[in-house]
């Protein structure tokens, strides 16, 4: 995508389609995507959340048992909270996200928080509304 920003709603739709496509090739997981707040009025950089979702899919594929992935987006004022969690797979390690942290730092400076714990990724962003 050559745009600098896309609607959060479009990004959520893209991630939903990505998970549906992954599920076509492997019926090893189910997923749920939920969104609260004004996702149709907030802009974010394209593909901002994709690396987190890809990491969850990779971890699910690493296990021989059926798993699930949950994505939750919550917009409150000028804050976005994104939570990606999965119930099977290897445990996550914060060092796995060093390049993503670099991108977030370039985009948001100190206006973000990224937490990685076991099988959950939480990203909080403070955004500038146009």
Tell what function each PLM region has.
Residues 1-126:
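Two-component histidine phosphotransfer core
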